[in-house]
């Protein structure tokens, strides 16, 4: 298992969607993560950056959509998402706060 030097190389950005907002009420937070990171690296990065305890991490690889342009076809970038569940009694994460 390769360790990345900086935990901010693992966590790219929070996912902004209706589903991710709904999951926040259940202590599940969604992040775009590096495609070559694993669940252990994601867990360590979230615990270091936000100072919380992680119960579990689920990941999803999403293929980029094929899009048509005037000159032919292209493809959006493929992404990896991580659904991070916090432990019971753990503080919530302010992912959209100004202090980040």
Curated annotation (Swiss-Prot):
GO cellular component: ribonucleoprotein complex; ribosome
Entry keywords, A to Z: Ribonucleoprotein, Ribosomal protein, RNA-binding, rRNA-binding
Pfam family, one: Ribosomal_L23
Gene Ontology biological process: translation
GO MF term set: rRNA binding; structural constituent of ribosome
Domain of life from the UniProt record: Bacteria
Keyword Hydrolase carried by entry: no
Subunit structure of this chain's protein: Part of the 50S ribosomal subunit. Contacts protein L29, and trigger factor when it is bound to the ribosome.
HAMAP family: Ribosomal_uL23_B
Family: Belongs to the universal ribosomal protein uL23 family.
Function of the protein: One of the early assembly proteins it binds 23S rRNA. One of the proteins that surrounds the polypeptide exit tunnel on the outside of the ribosome. Forms the main docking site for trigger factor binding to the ribosome.
Listed name of the protein: Large ribosomal subunit protein uL23
Gene name in the database record: rplW
């Amino acid at each position: 298992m390769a360790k990345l030097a900086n935990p901010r190389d693992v966590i790219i950005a929070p996912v902004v969607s209706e589903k991710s907002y709904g999951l926040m009420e259940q202590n599940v937070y969604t992040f775009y993560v590096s495609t070559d990171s694993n669940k252990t690296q994601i867990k360590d990065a979230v615990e270091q950056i936000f100072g919380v305890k992680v119960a579990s991490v689920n990941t999803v690889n999403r293929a980029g959509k094929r899009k048509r342009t005037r000159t032919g076809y292209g493809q959006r970038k493929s992404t990896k998402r991580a659904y991070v569940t916090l432990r019971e009694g753990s503080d919530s994460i302010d992912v959209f706060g100004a202090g980040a």
